[in-house]
């Protein structure tokens, strides 16, 4: 059995990637949090405890949970994989010329466990086994990072997107996140969990390459939903560009992987950075949505054209909710709106009330703090499993953001 492929948003979830908070989050400060795309610093110990609870609740449902730091450690045990990463991460463009050879030699000899910790957590000048020197070394000062930390690996949804029987490795919008794509690509290419299937053609990389400059064609997985029945929803807001959507659609159509892409043009805002921050699938016909944003989304339908490489494009008059229902072959969706009065709705959307992960049809994991929205979901027949979001949510992501499904069943309608 091929244990890869995501064929819906709510079918039985069987295998998922997560990334627990760690060293990168310990390096967050009030001074650098915004640059690293966090709104606040975390109580890291509590965040790790809450993340473990999240993982255990998925495992209790029979889901195989793969921790990204562990995957990376197991990947860099392979000398070829280690070289592949370091050739791209430790070069003149990244660390200058003065310390390049010493830094590379140190990392070449490092244990796989410590190297994986540093690749995600970053390396400060204090941790170097030699005195910083050269232009770059002196520029960093006493508290700079030779390799910046990657705290947003907590949200592995974004750096790659499994779409039916393949995956995109996404060129991300903000520089603070772009190295994530290199690391996840290495895992898919070299890790024993993935490499045999990749080499056998059991799954394909549809689009994206960390060796290429994609320019303004940026994409992040929080905008990408393998909706089912050959359809894909892709948000276009703060992080995912129309150039990327067009390229992804073209590759999917060329490979026969999808028959329709619904591009969803969203307002560009921090609170609605991805489609999944305002819209999540919870049950066969149930979604939760922040309608203040969803009602403003302009949708476009892309389909394969009559000739090779051609895409038919149509600006839609229908609402996102109706198009999503049409893709599933059902009359309409039961839309559970963000709960509470005007103020509470805005607060709960900000706290990821509409960013839930379905473990199977009608069962989701949500943050405990979003009591109004969770109550409405339960009234709609959805089982809501809660985890604490007080610390984990400080990076603006809920259960949907904190998971990258790699194997999920289809749903029949």
Swiss-Prot record:
GO terms for biological process: arginine catabolic process to ornithine; arginine deiminase pathway. Gene3D superfamilies: Arginine deiminase (1.10.3930.10), L-arginine/glycine Amidinotransferase, Chain A (3.75.10.10). Pathway: Amino-acid degradation; L-arginine degradation via ADI pathway; carbamoyl phosphate from L-arginine: step 1/2. It is an enzyme of class 3 (hydrolase). Pfam families: ADI. One of its GO terms (cellular component) is cytoplasm. The keyword ATP-binding does not apply. This is Arginine deiminase. The gene is arcA.
């Amino acid at each position: 059995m091929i244990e890869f492929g995501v064929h819906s948003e709510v079918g039985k979830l069987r295998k998922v990637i997560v990334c627990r908070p760690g060293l990168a989050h310990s390096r967050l400060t009030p001074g650098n949090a915004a640059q690293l795309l966090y709104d606040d610093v975390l109580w890291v110990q509590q965040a790790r405890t809450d993340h473990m609870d999240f993982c255990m609740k998925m495992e209790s449902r029979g889901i195989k949970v793969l921790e990204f730091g562990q995957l990376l450690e197991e990947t860099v045990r392979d000398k070829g994989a280690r070289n592949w990463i370091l050739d791209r991460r430790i070069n003149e463009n990244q660390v200058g010329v003065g310390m390049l050879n010493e830094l590379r030699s140190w990392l070449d000899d490092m244990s796989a466990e410590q190297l994986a910790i540093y690749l995600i957590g970053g390396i400060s000048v204090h941790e170097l086994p030699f005195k910083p020197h050269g232009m770059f070394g002196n520029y960093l000062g006493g508290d700079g990072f030779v390799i910046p930390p990657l705290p947003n690996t907590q949200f592995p949804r974004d750096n790659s997107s499994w779409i039916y029987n393949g995956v995109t490795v996404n060129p991300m919008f903000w520089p603070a996140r772009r190295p994530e794509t290199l690391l996840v690509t290495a895992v898919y290419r070299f890790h024993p969990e993935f490499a045999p299937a990749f080499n056998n053609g059991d799954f394909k990389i549809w689009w994206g390459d960390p060796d290429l400059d994609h320019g303004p064609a940026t994409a992040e997985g929080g905008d990408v939903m393998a909706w089912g029945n050959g359809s894909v929803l892709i948000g276009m807001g703060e992080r995912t560009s129309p150039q990327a959507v067009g390229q992804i659609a073209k590759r999917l159509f060329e490979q026969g992987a999808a028959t329709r892409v619904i591009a969803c043009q969203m307002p560009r805002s921090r609170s609605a950075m991805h489609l999944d921050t305002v819209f999540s699938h919870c049950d066969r016909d149930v979604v939760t949505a922040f309608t203040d944003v969803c009602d403003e989304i302009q949708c476009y339908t892309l389909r394969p054209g009559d000739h090779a490489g051609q895409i038919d494009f149509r600006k839609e008059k229908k609402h996102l909710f109706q198009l999503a229902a049409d893709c599933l072959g059902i009359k309409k969706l039961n839309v559970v709106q963000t709960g509470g009065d005007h103020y509470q709705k805005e607060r709960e959307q900000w706290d990821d009330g509409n960013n839930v992960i379905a473990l199977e049809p009608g069962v989701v994991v949500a943050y405990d703090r979003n009591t109004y929205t969770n109550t409405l979901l339960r009234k709609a027949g959805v089982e809501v499993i809660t985890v604490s979001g007080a610390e984990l949510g400080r990076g603006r992501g809920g259960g949907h953001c904190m998971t990258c499904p790699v194997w999920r069943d289809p749903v029949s309608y």
